[in-house]
Amino acid sequence: MSSKQEPVVLGKLGSSHGIKGWLKITTYTDSVEGIFDYSPWLLKEQGEWREVKVLQWRMQGKAVVACLEGVETRDQAQALTNCEIAVTPEQMEVLPEDEFYWRDLIGCEVVNTKGYNMGKVQEIVETGSNDVLLVKANAKDGFGKAERMIPFVTEQFIQKVDLTAKQILVDWDPDF
């Protein structure tokens, strides 16, 4: 199954909350409420994905809790602790041409404007001011680098992103 078909993980279930089957939610979406824009959810239990509906959710202090269909007791909720929450790729919003999901950038080759292959995007780090590509250098990197951190700032450093070719063109010195 390609990464395009794999479910998109948006969070995970935390510990149970109360005695009626509510669960704390850890969300990876930009806003805490963003995870509830998607329905149904997919839960990964024992390596298998299954569909589940959110019946209710609310803020509980600084935490967010939810009640899921078919989860009515504390024991049922505890059995789901640490399950990943995902959605199908088709449920994801279509982004404007100049915006990208991180999952689509991971694995892209990074080439600078002089044609030097700097490696592949291994991870993306959120720094507050801008995202940063963590690029794992090729084994035979001519500059002796194991990895590079390249700010994802379009026009200044990121010249072009071609998701079809899985390539990112950057204006970046390979010695950095």
Curated annotation (Swiss-Prot):
The keyword 4Fe-4S appears for this protein: no
Domain (PRC barrel): residue spans on this chain: 96-176
GO cellular component terms attached to this protein's record: cytoplasm; ribosome
Alphabetically ordered keywords of this record: Chaperone, Cytoplasm, Ribosome biogenesis, rRNA processing
Signal sequence segment: none
Pfam family, one: PRC_RimM
Highest taxon in the source lineage: Bacteria
GO biological process: ribosomal small subunit biogenesis; rRNA processing
Tagged with keyword Magnesium: no
Main location, first listed in the record: cytoplasm
GO molecular function: ribosome binding
SUPFAM superfamilies: PRC-barrel domain, Translation proteins
Domain text: The PRC barrel domain binds ribosomal protein uS19.
Family statement drawn from the similarity comment of this UniProt entry: Belongs to the RimM family.
UniProt protein name: Ribosome maturation factor RimM
Organism: Shewanella piezotolerans (strain WP3 / JCM 13877)
